[in-house]
Amino acid sequence: MLITNPALLGILASLAPLALGAPNQSTQARSRKCVIPSSYTSSQGTADDSPAVAGAFAQCAENSVIIFQEGVDYNIFHPIKATNLSNVEIRVLGNLHLPQDITAVQNIVKSGQNTWFTFQGPRVDWTGADDINNGWINSYGQAWWDANPANSSSFPNRPHLMSYKTSQASIKNFRSRKPIAWNVKLHGDDITVTHAIVDAKSTGGFPFNTDGFDVEGTNISITDSVMYNGDDAIAVNTPSHNIVFARNTIGYQSHGMSIGSLGKDPTDFANITNLRFEDVTVIDALYAARFKSWSGGKGLVKNVVWKNIRVFNVTFPIFVTQSYSDQSASRSGTIDPSSSVMMEDFTWSNFSGSINTYHPGDGSCVTNPCWYNAGLPNLKHTEAIVLECNTESSCKNFRTEGIRLYPQSKDSPSVICMKATAELNPKLGFECKNGTFVPQ
């Protein structure tokens, strides 16, 4: 993508020292090469290539290139686990297929193998095909989504697609088609993700929990990517520092660019700093910019910016809750409702576009009231901004500017604001009360 906007170029240049994670900087050659054979064609798509794949990762675990051949299909009928990798490039030039037998996959997950691909080690790069027709992981999630029981949000024994723990690495052209549920759990330091595609658009049942990237680490960037799914496009979890999410398009029934959820376990102290979400287009989503923490949590999230965000038909463009709940999860132990994950130095700048007034929400609602409407007084679905601070001291130095968000009904945009005090938030940009949004 050629970027010519001088202002945007300046913004991205300013981000570089913060969080555009470093690509592979190893000086050691990848001298070994393992080309993975496939039995897909000879068996008319019935043979399992997992043993050959596992063998390649065992043989070429260090200083190597592991190649899924160009234009070749592979059946990955059993999970692949490679946790002793070092200085390896995984070159995915063909297409990978998970089993289409739901019961067989559920039995594997019940046995304790709940992640289909597990990669771990320093300098582990993923290089997908340049050809858009190749480099796909096909999970056949549509059948799972359609099989989900009515009024249920959690079909049992669904696998996570991938756990990726590395450092000084790059992921390029990662492509996931119809994931069963969670896509990539990305943990580590100095990682760049570019030109990823997550396609979880459904023709039937709702694609619950199809998160794009669940991120935890330092100096991680995700750029120039497209994610259409039914949960967070990115969810930043603790501990995380110096994260950039830029020049991306997200949508379908996405839950947007999220931080959290945090604080469900009050003994887990949240520690997140320096996040940038910039130049992102959000289409038909439930949320665009979102923060979610549980009441009773502890910790600090500091220095967060959402900037230059374009929204089209989004129900909640800007949303903060410090009293989050999950319709499919419960909590145990003693909870102090006056305790919060503290939020400090948050900026929402240059938001433009349309608020979903006529058909708000998404297909994830299985309760009454819907989980995303619970606790919101007099909801009109004209809200440009929702800020739910847990206490009068838990939100500090909030700032909004350039908010140009308008309901499709052509009513005036409104705001729901709780406990973001003027004393702690002198540059909030509007008066913290429920009603018409009037920028100051």
From Swiss-Prot:
Belongs to the glycosyl hydrolase 28 family. It holds the Pfam family Glyco_hydro_28. GO terms for biological process: cell wall organization; pectin catabolic process. Specific in hydrolyzing the terminal glycosidic bond of polygalacturonic acid and oligogalacturonates. Glycans are attached at residues 24, 84, 151, 219, 271, 313, 350, 434. Disulfide bonds join 389-395. It comes from Neosartorya fischeri (strain ATCC 1020 / DSM 3700 / CBS 544.65 / FGSC A1164 / JCM 1740 / NRRL 181 / WB 181). PbH1 repeats lie at residues 217-238, 240-261, 272-293. Residues 1-21 form the signal peptide. It comes from the Eukaryota. Its main location: secreted. It catalyses: [(1->4)-alpha-D-galacturonosyl](n) + H2O = alpha-D-galacturonate + [(1->4)-alpha-D-galacturonosyl](n-1). The active site is at 231 (proton donor), 255. Its EC number is 3.2.1.67. GO terms for molecular function: galacturan 1,4-alpha-galacturonidase activity; polygalacturonase activity. The keyword Heme does not apply. This is Probable exopolygalacturonase C. It is an enzyme of class 3 (hydrolase). It is found in: Secreted. InterPro entries: Glyco_hydro_28, Pectin_lyas_fold, Pectin_lyase_fold/virulence. The gene is pgxC. One of its GO terms (cellular component) is extracellular region. The keyword NAD does not apply. PANTHER family: EXOPOLYGALACTURONASE C-RELATED, PTHR31736. Keywords: Cell wall biogenesis/degradation, Disulfide bond, Glycoprotein, Glycosidase, Hydrolase, Repeat, Secreted, Signal.
